[in-house]
Amino acid sequence: MPRKGQVERRDVMADPIYNSKLVTRLINRLMLDGKKGTAQQILYKAFEAIAERSGRDAMEVFEEAMNNIMPVLEVKARRVGGANYQVPVEVRPERRTTLALRYLVNYSRLRNEKTMDARLANEIMDAANNTGASVKKREDMHKMAEANKAFAHYRW
């Protein structure tokens, strides 16, 4: 923990093409080894593929997918009297988007399509249709929170 108080959060610049901070954050999550240009190309190709296949605006599909991936509840480990309890807690809005982006990129990387832009496009489209691995991850988190609802009074 820093001694000089709370660290100020840096604001990301909005994406020049889609004019969205969420898109910039997705590009930053996609980026490997500082290669931002490559990450941008992957995302823009994926968005083109989404627009072509769905016949809708890619940003619309992406925002719908994000809403389907964002978790509302999660569990945190809390130690009480020598036992660890999985305590369900509500997820803050900023963390919701962070987790959703993380799940989207991680499960896109695990897919079997040939190129990363195809993987990302398919995962976004699956998420928009409430299917796909990233949506399943969210459902699993909610199931865990529901199963441990009895420990909700240990919340802090």
Curated annotation (Swiss-Prot):
**What Gene3D superfamilies does this protein map onto?**
Ribosomal protein S7 domain
Q: Which cellular component, as a GO term, is one annotated location?
A: small ribosomal subunit
Print the keywords alphabetically.
Ribonucleoprotein, Ribosomal protein, RNA-binding, rRNA-binding, tRNA-binding
Instruction: Provide the GO MF annotations for this entry.
Output: rRNA binding; structural constituent of ribosome; tRNA binding
Name the domain of life.
Bacteria
Name the SUPFAM superfamilies for this protein.
Ribosomal protein S7
State the InterPro entries in the record.
Ribosomal_uS7, Ribosomal_uS7_bac/org-type, Ribosomal_uS7_CS, Ribosomal_uS7_dom, Ribosomal_uS7_dom_sf
GO BP term, pick one: translation
Q: Which Pfam families match?
A: Ribosomal_S7 (PF00177)
PANTHER family for the chain: RIBOSOMAL PROTEIN S7 (PTHR11205)
The job of this chain, per UniProt, is described as: One of the primary rRNA binding proteins, it binds directly to 16S rRNA where it nucleates assembly of the head domain of the 30S subunit. Is located at the subunit interface close to the decoding center, probably blocks exit of the E-site tRNA.
| Family stated for the protein in its record | Belongs to the universal ribosomal protein uS7 family.
**Oligomer and partners:** Part of the 30S ribosomal subunit. Contacts proteins S9 and S11.
What's this protein's name? Answer: Small ribosomal subunit protein uS7
Which source organism? Exiguobacterium sibiricum (strain DSM 17290 / CCUG 55495 / CIP 109462 / JCM 13490 / 255-15)
